[in-house]
């Protein structure tokens, strides 16, 4: 398995393409000058395309991924109805979802053989919409509306429309601000990081299309932290044993262990990281975590070590200005 890392730096309008070496170092392969401020990114399920949300002309650009080394070439684009804050796809690669914080909406774009096409549907009224997350069974789209302290639940139809589920939403505590989410790789649980109070909620999905319950909320900040809370991103290892979330004010990554059944998180430590970590990701082997410092203009690579999953820095690398997003692709070559 070979792995390629992509970092998006909107201030310099660049995508950096790196090879992740087996020992955890990065080798720069390519710098792509993008036609705008590149922010959210996602890799297609078949690993052939990298999709990038661009501002100020709101659109999604598809870059074709070279099979031999992961480098990029532009393949197509489509307009978006709002400024893209977060993008993702369904598991079949037929639809792309774009959440827009400023527009308070989520849109669905049809993908035609991997290339973005027409917008199928737009759902508005989602104040502070910060992500769109398809469930493991590809049926339910979870859409956190940060300003409304709720996560809206939609059924994805075969033609790409979104229909409110019953219940149509789950709510957090007041002032939490749900932002990004991940699903356990094999157990019926979801985890959501809350931006405004820097906490993580555990949602039990015993009946993922009906009875959804928050079974745990954990403070992710160090005990002596007293500044403004400003959480950003969350990811889980491929084996489901460790979960990580970052806070931008404290510039830390919080390390959690996950119980065997997925229902309980436990804080193991707080890793100081790059200044204002806006985004990070975990490689496909579960050995490395790569974090982007929006104010340090660097990325840092950490080894994930031991039963606790604590982080050990392996190196840091200058990227473009204001890096915000990290995605990692694995391929056979």
Curated annotation (Swiss-Prot):
Enzyme class: hydrolase
Alphabetized Gene3D superfamilies for the sequence: YVTN repeat-like/Quinoprotein amine dehydrogenase
GO cellular component term of the entry, any: cytosol
Enzyme Commission designation: 3.1.1.31
UniProt catalytic activity: 6-phospho-D-glucono-1,5-lactone + H2O = 6-phospho-D-gluconate + H(+)
Taxonomy, superkingdom: Bacteria
Gene Ontology biological-process annotations: glucose metabolic process; pentose-phosphate shunt, oxidative branch
MF terms (GO), sorted A to Z: 6-phosphogluconolactonase activity
Keywords linked to the UniProt accession: Carbohydrate metabolism, Glucose metabolism, Hydrolase
InterPro entries: 6-phosphogluconolactonase_YbhE, Cycloisomerase_2, Lactonase_7-beta_prop, N2O_reductase_N, WD40/YVTN_repeat-like_dom_sf
Pathways per UniProt: Carbohydrate degradation; pentose phosphate pathway; D-ribulose 5-phosphate from D-glucose 6-phosphate (oxidative stage): step 2/3
Pfam families for this protein: Lactonase (PF10282)
SUPFAM superfamilies for the chain: Nitrous oxide reductase, N-terminal domain
Biological role: Catalyzes the hydrolysis of 6-phosphogluconolactone to 6-phosphogluconate.
Family per record: Belongs to the cycloisomerase 2 family.
Protein name, as recorded: 6-phosphogluconolactonase
Organism of derivation: Cronobacter sakazakii (strain ATCC BAA-894)
